[in-house]
Every structure is written in C-alpha cells, then in structure tokens.
C-alpha cells in the first residue's frame, strides 16, 4: 500500500465550536464538494473517500506533488472558510456570530485547529478508515440515515454500486472487492 498509495491520510476537519453549519445550511456542503473537485483537478490530491456531517468532515486522500498534508489542509480550510463566511453573510448574517474570532488577523474562524491526520499505512487500515467514513451517517448522535448509501454527502454509494455522483472521487477496487 505504501508504494501504491504513498502520502495517503485519513483526515478529520471539524467546524469551530462544532456548529452544525452543514446541517443548518445544506448549500455549504456544495462548497466542500466544489473545493474537493478543485483540489483534484489541480493535481494536489486524490480523494478516495469522504463524508460531510453536520459539523465535521472525514476524508481519505492522497497528497500529490511533494506537498505536505498540512499545507493542503491549510489551503483547503482557508479557501472553504472564506467561501462559507461569504455565503453566510448573504443568507444569515446573524449565524456568523458563532464564528467571530478573538484573533486580530481574522474576523471569523470557521474551522477548528486540525490535529487529526493519520497516515494510512496498510490495506487493512485503508479499509477500516473508509468503512468508518461510510458508516458515520448511520451511527450514534450523527445518525441521519439507516443505509449509508442513501446519504448524499458521502462516497459510500460509489463504493456499493460504482455510482459516478462525484467526478473527483477515485474509487479503490481493493475496497470495493473487500481485499
């Protein structure tokens, strides 16, 4: 796996204060999807699995071109944070109060500080992380659906029926076939 998929990470990014922005403003999910597409189209990453939950996202992605995962995350969070702020300014300015920053270098803070990048270093770990991502909408406090393939903002359907919902997604045959 390390030679086939080097620099592959399981990453969790959470909204600051765990505000449910993706649930309260479903259009903000498309900001994330479009940003994923941009990262893939620009050759910065390959995305193997993802889920967007009400206040966080999980991704299994491969960082390309000699970049660090931290640089990609910083760029992604800066870009999506700005777009989410602009969107909220247009649709519900009061909601932005949840994100007022106490730092002098920014007015708002959308994302929490990221600490959760785990290098995926085996085929088993890859399968475990992708299954975890796909089951996220069916478990515990985050349960929104019974069947993970019916949750739109996830790669689960692509792994069950080879759906092409998301052009930026690279489906791994090893995971589909369970090997």
Q: Model-derived features: where do they sit?
A:
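Short catalytic/metal-binding and nucleic-acid-binding patches
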Residues: 1-179
């Amino acid at each position: 796996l390390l030679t086939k998929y080097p620099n592959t990470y399981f990453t969790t990014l959470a909204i600051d204060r765990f505000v449910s922005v993706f649930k309260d403003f479903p259009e903000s999910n498309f900001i994330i999807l479009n940003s994923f597409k941009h990262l893939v189209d620009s050759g910065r990453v390959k995305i193997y699995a993802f889920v967007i939950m009400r206040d966080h996202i999980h991704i299994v992605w491969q960082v390309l071109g000699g970049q660090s995962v931290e640089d990609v995350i910083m760029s992604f969070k800066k870009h999506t944070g700005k777009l989410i702020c602009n969107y909220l300014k247009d649709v519900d300015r009061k909601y932005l109060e949840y994100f007022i920053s106490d730092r002098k270098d920014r007015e708002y803070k959308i994302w929490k500080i990221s600490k959760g990048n785990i290098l995926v270093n085996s085929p088993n770990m890859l399968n475990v992380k992708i299954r975890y991502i796909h089951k996220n909408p069916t478990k515990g406090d985050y349960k929104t659906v019974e069947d993970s393939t019916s949750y739109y903002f996830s790669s689960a359907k692509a792994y069950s029926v080879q759906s092409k919902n998301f052009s930026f997604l690279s489906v791994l045959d090893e995971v589909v076939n369970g090997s």
